Amino acid sequence: MRIAVIGPGAVGGVIAAWLAQNEAFEVEVCARTAFDRLEVATPGGPLTATPRVLTAPDQASQVDWAIITTKTYDAAATGAWLARLIGPDTRVAVLQNGVEHVERFTPYVAAERITPAVVDIPAERSAPGRVRQRRDGTILVPEGAAGEAFVALFVHTPIGVFTTPDFKTAAWKKLALNCAGAVNALTLKPAGVAQGEPIADIMRALVGECVAVGRAEGADLPSDLPETVVAGCRAGPADGVNSLHADRAAGRPMELDARNGVIVRLGARHGIATPVNAMVVALLDAAAS
């Protein structure tokens, strides 16, 4: 089976390295920068892999699975890869933040080919091909034949990959956590900043707006989700840095639209006010300009 991982950053590097451990898989990675091998520091020890590294779409050919792990704002560049990778039977998995996995890529591939995925694999990339994986992590995909086929790709790995009967709710719950992380990008302070009650109140407000919009979109979100998100942030490592924070600190583009902007956009569609998320988007946009 031929598998292409588009975007071998932190999560993509982990995915590609683990898939490459199966000798039945021919794994290749679609990257901007060439590297000699993947080295992943996993919870169980070092993991190495030598997938084929492609640096231009014209080097690619049709595969059985195209797994997208790029940033959400890289859809157009990813589309150039998909044009070469997709054949008559190719399946596409989108492992990204947000709740618009399918919509983001329908300009490039038919919606019925796309398997959206909610990923929880804490990892950081230190250099091309060099990644630290903090936990084995989990991936959730929708129930159905495509979801089951995706789960089967990972049976040889310690990553927990499961189907869920309510993917929409799973995606919005992940968004609730992600949208609260904007306070870290704004303050440039790690997770411990949530210990302060004024900051926790802002996080609760961000998540509360997410809950209202998510429910309007059909997600089954509990009323206590804002408190659950704050409690989770407070219980985790105080020095934890989320990807939005890390990207702003490094001067990289941020996934602001997928994490907070989408709440504002969809809220407007439903007539739901989202002033706190709108303020966060405006402030971070200004900070990045």
What are the roles of these predicted feature ranges?
Residues 1-4:
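Extreme N-terminal starter segment of soluble prokaryotic enzymes
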Residues 8-9:
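Glycine-rich Rossmann-fold phosphate-binding loop(s) that bind the pyrophosphate
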Residues 12-13:
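N-terminal Rossmann-fold NAD(P) dinucleotide-binding loop
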Residues 18, 30, 34, 38, ...:
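Rossmann-like NAD(P)(H) cofactor-binding subdomain of soluble oxidoreductases
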Residues 23-27:
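A generic structural motif
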Residues 95-174, 180:
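Rossmann-fold dinucleotide-binding core
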Residues 168-212, 237-238:
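Active-site-proximal catalytic alpha-helix in oxidoreductases
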Residues 204, 208-289:
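NAD(P)-dependent Rossmann-like dehydrogenase/reductase catalytic/cofactor-binding core
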